[in-house]
């Protein structure tokens, strides 16, 4: 894994004790080597979903992503990967059910996390004491942004894209789109939900992600329900 900035950590390098901290972890799924022992960590439902994927590459990436997710959550919590119980809340958002005592977590504290992937890249955002949502997209140079902007964005954001210069259009589109997705995932609602709206004084913050991995440009957004110590640029 690569350390991109203050809230993107190397695996096993940073402690996770500050309840205001948020970490984002990246990996290239095509470079992840999974063995039978690691695959045994996965739940029956995870194996069943993998079996339904007919495309071998998609299946390999899915399994690698599930193993990587458990590795990160195990590193953060100190709980063995095979003992982690990933559940879904009432809105269907994945979350981690923790025992009352963990090596790095005090009693009754719930770790929040969110996962996003694009092509062969996957990222995980982890946080304590606040909801978090993350979304990333690999930039597609051949995408007709003006043609699809009005179907993906609300009126105000679409107008910003339509009026943007050619040089800034692609980055702006992906920033706006991933921001909306990350916010929806933080809330646990769909991106078209009425809950996804603007407010001038939100009890949440948005951070931008821009990085290059394996010669690909990745744009993303991180939505955090409360102010954190994460160091990143704002939109």
Pin down the residues of each PLM region.
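Core catalytic alpha/beta fold that binds nucleotide/phospho-ligands
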Residues: 1-235
């Amino acid at each position: 894994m690569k350390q991109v900035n203050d809230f993107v950590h190397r695996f096993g390098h940073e402690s996770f004790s500050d309840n205001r901290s948020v970490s984002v972890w990246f990996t290239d799924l095509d470079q992840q080597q999974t063995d039978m022992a690691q695959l045994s960590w996965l739940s029956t439902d995870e194996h069943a979903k993998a079996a339904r994927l007919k495309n071998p590459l998609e299946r390999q990436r899915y399994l690698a992503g599930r193993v990587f997710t458990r590795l990160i959550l195990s590193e953060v919590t100190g709980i063995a990967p095979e003992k982690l119980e990933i559940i879904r809340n009432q809105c269907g958002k994945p979350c981690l059910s923790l025992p009352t005592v963990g090596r790095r977590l005090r009693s009754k504290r719930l770790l929040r996390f969110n996962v996003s992937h694009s092509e062969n890249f996957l990222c995980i955002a982890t946080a304590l004491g606040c909801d978090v949502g993350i979304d990333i997209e690999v930039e597609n140079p051949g995408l007709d942004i003006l043609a699809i902007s009005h179907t993906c964005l609300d009126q105000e954001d679409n107008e910003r894209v339509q009026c943007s210069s050619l040089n800034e259009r692609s980055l702006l589109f992906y920033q706006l789109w991933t921001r909306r997705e990350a916010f929806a995932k933080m809330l646990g609602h769909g991106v078209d939900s009425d809950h996804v709206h603007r407010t001038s004084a939100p009890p949440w913050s948005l951070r931008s992600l821009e990085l290059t991995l394996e010669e690909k440009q990745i744009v993303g957004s991180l939505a955090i329900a409360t102010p954190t110590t994460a160091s990143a640029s704002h939109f």
